[in-house]
Amino acid sequence: MRKKFFCTFPQGLISEPIISHTLGERFAVIPNIRAASISDTMALVAVEIDGEPKAIEDSVAYLRERGVKVEEMTDNE
């Protein structure tokens, strides 16, 4: 299964490799960053996450627990 999300990272998490490293290792998903805009105060990231439904759900919950705002994208976005 593959789902698309739009993530807003707060300033304190910008330099951490949460998507590229942590999600893949901790939740056995394959994240694919499709677009990103990063400034000194926040990061906006469009990402596809491929994996089992429960693993995707757990990875999104983890991001939210860390303070990332996560919104699922529709097929039109």
Language-model region placement:
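Long, contiguous binding/interaction regions
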Residues: 1-77
